[in-house]
């Protein structure tokens, strides 16, 4: 199960598609991709 926007994360793999882990803040943020 992936983490949605602003969900807690340890790595980008924790986040849903088009989201990447912001390591400093430890949450998933949009990675600026669409496809």
Swiss-Prot record:
Disulfide bonds: 2-16, 9-21, 15-28
One protein family per Pfam: Toxin_12
Region described as Involved in active face: 4-6
Cellular compartments annotated: Secreted
Domain of life according to the entry: Eukaryota
Record-annotated site: May be involved in interaction with voltage sensor: 3, 22
Keywords, sorted A to Z: Disulfide bond, Ion channel impairing toxin, Knottin, Neurotoxin, Potassium channel impairing toxin, Secreted, Toxin, Voltage-gated potassium channel impairing toxin
A cellular component annotation (GO) from this entry: extracellular region
Tissue-level expression: Expressed by the venom gland.
Site residues, Involved in active face: 30
UniProt xrefs under InterPro entries: Huwentoxin-1 (IPR011696)
Record GO terms (molecular function): ion channel inhibitor activity; potassium channel regulator activity; toxin activity
Function: Inhibitor of voltage-gated potassium channels. Inhibits Kv2.1/KCNB1 channels, by shifting activation of the channel to more depolarized voltages. The toxin binding sites may be situated on the S3-S4 extracellular linker of the channel. One, two, three or four toxin molecules may bind the Kv2.1/KCNB1 channel. May need to partition into the membrane in order to bind to the channel. Antibacterial activity is not observed.
Family assignment from sequence similarity: Belongs to the neurotoxin 10 (Hwtx-1) family. 09 (HaTx) subfamily.
Domain remark in the UniProt entry: The presence of a 'disulfide through disulfide knot' structurally defines this protein as a knottin.
Protein name listed in UniProt: Kappa-theraphotoxin-Gr1b
